[in-house]
């Protein structure tokens, strides 16, 4: 944090001072990179004359005003147009996708779903120079260690002859190509799909698709098993059981009355499954499987993993989301901070009021819901905020606000 404040002070002081600070950092970095085997030619091509990109810093620090509901997330990513474009790609690249699926066991609809979500099937690869972006972020200091490592890997990719420094473009964070691989992911999993002796995840679709399939296989993909399916929950369902950490055999969920939303039988899988409620108990419900965890290794967002499942399902001709969306409004970041603060003051540990919906805050919401006989889904719905505000006001009026620990949340039976 101190480094971030210093950076802001430097930028505010003017471009000359900022450039001097950056040049000093860059000189030391070049020496380290050279000591690690990066060639002088690559260092010159990638870093000579480079200046910090203030737009990259702005994007790195950008904070949304509101949380995003699951339905909002899907509305932007799994649309009829996106499905239609994906089905056209399935037809156009059928032979290539068949070959990739045969080698790696990753369904073609899943690969195309990743492709659509990452870059709209190659339409939006990112136009920022990756070495410049990574150098800016490594100098910035907020996550300097991570981005310094990514910059070194980007230089190694250039050094290996896979792409020139000027053609290595991507997102502001350094994600590259059709599947938006970070440099470290490229070096660990990218493969030469077209056999031309170099790996070009930007212009060679075989390289991009083979690389993505290799990643998913190495991440532990389970053949012939879904990522997630929409389900219908029975009347009287114990909402405490709807959490990704609560895994049961599919047969046990069936015995509890859980059914597939499309009336098909629940899939038979070797592992265990969980039920998740991305928009609370009033919204859609999903059963997630081991491949959900694989997708979460690619992107740690549960909404993203569910979007992969839904888009791939629709690409294969399946139905769109069947259930209602739940409470449509999302809390603002400031409202979530207020919710966290109120829970803390009532003795329920929600962590630092930061406006971020992490596991600690979700558990705190569950504790509150259990104490007040509300559906225990851990979701920060506007109705939950209103209930907490009312209870907080009553506790304050009675002089009962406290920071003492609240009763422990009662886990459902059968939790591993």
Tell where the protein language model's regions lie, with residue ranges.
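Sec-dependent signal peptide recognition
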Residues: 2-7
């Amino acid at each position: 944090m101190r480094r971030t404040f210093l950076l802001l002070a430097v930028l505010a002081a003017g471009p000359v001072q900022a450039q001097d600070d950056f040049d000093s950092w860059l000189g030391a970095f070049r020496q380290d990179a050279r000591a690690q085997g990066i060639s002088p030619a690559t260092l010159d091509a990638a870093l000579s004359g480079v200046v910090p990109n203030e737009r990259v810093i702005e994007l790195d620090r950008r904070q949304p005003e509101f949380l995003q509901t699951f339905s909002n997330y899907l509305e932007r990513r799994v649309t009829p147009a996106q499905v239609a474009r994906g089905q056209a790609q399935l037809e156009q690249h059928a032979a290539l996708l068949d070959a990739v699926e045969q080698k790696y066991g990753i369904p073609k609809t899943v690969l195309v779903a990743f492709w659509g979500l990452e870059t709209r099937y190659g339409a939006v690869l990112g136009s920022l120079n990756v070495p410049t972006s990574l150098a800016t972020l490594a100098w910035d200091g907020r996550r300097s260690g991570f981005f310094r490592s990514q910059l070194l890997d980007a230089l190694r990719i250039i050094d290996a002859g896979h792409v020139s420094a000027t053609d290595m473009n991507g997102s502001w964070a350094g994600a590259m190509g059709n599947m938006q691989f970070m440099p470290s992911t490229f070096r660990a999993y990218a493969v030469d799909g077209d056999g031309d002796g170099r790996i070009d995840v930007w212009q060679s679709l075989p390289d991009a698709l083979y690389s993505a399939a290799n990643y998913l296989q190495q991440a532990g993909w389970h053949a012939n098993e879904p990522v997630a399916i929409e389900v219908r929950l029975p009347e009287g369902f114990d909402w405490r059981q709807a959490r990704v950490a609560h895994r049961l055999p599919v047969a046990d969920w069936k015995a509890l009355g859980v059914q597939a939303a499309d009336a098909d039988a629940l899939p038979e899988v070797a592992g265990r499954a969980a039920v998740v409620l991305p928009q609370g108990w009033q919204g859609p419900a999903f059963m997630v499987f081991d491949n959900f965890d694989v997708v979460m290794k690619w992107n740690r967002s549960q909404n993203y993993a569910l979007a992969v499942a839904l888009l791939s399902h629709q690409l294969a001709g399946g139905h769109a989301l069947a259930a209602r969306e739940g409470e449509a409004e999302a809390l603002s970041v400031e409202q979530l901070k207020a919710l966290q603060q109120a829970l803390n003051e009532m003795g329920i540990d929600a962590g630092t009021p930061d406006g971020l919906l992490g596991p600690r805050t979700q558990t705190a919401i569950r504790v509150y819901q259990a104490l007040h006989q509300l559906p225990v889904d851990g979701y920060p719905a506007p109705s939950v905020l209103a209930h907490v505000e009312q209870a907080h006001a009553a506790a304050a009026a009675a002089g009962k606000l406290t920071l003492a620990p609240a009763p422990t949340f009662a886990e459902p039976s059968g939790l591993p």
